[in-house]
Amino acid sequence: ALPIFLLRKQESGVHFNDEIYSNIDLMFGYVEKSVGGMLKVLSNLENVDEHDIIACYNREREINNLRNQLRTANVVNINGRHYEYQSGIYYMDIISTLEKAGDFIINVVDTIRDEFRNKK
């Protein structure tokens, strides 16, 4: 989905300002940390550390909180004409897609957690 949004953005001639790019980069960083946490859990399935699982859930909450903050700020920025409405739409599509990646990551961690608890 992300490549589709980027292609549509480019085809429509929509431009992002530096703030939007910075926020997208920030969200990518959060998701990257989440992937790292998931990989850490996956790397030691025989001895899953509960602290690593908890850290994954904390990262997911951070992703959700950032998404909520960016969504609220997006409405304010569009209303304040800080950037165009269409820019805000594509921006939020990208942020939502990245947040969904966080959801997929936590689904993997949920499965590992459930297996870990069933073995105890």
Regions found by a protein language model. Name each.
Residues 1-120:
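Cytosolic, long alpha-helical scaffolding segments
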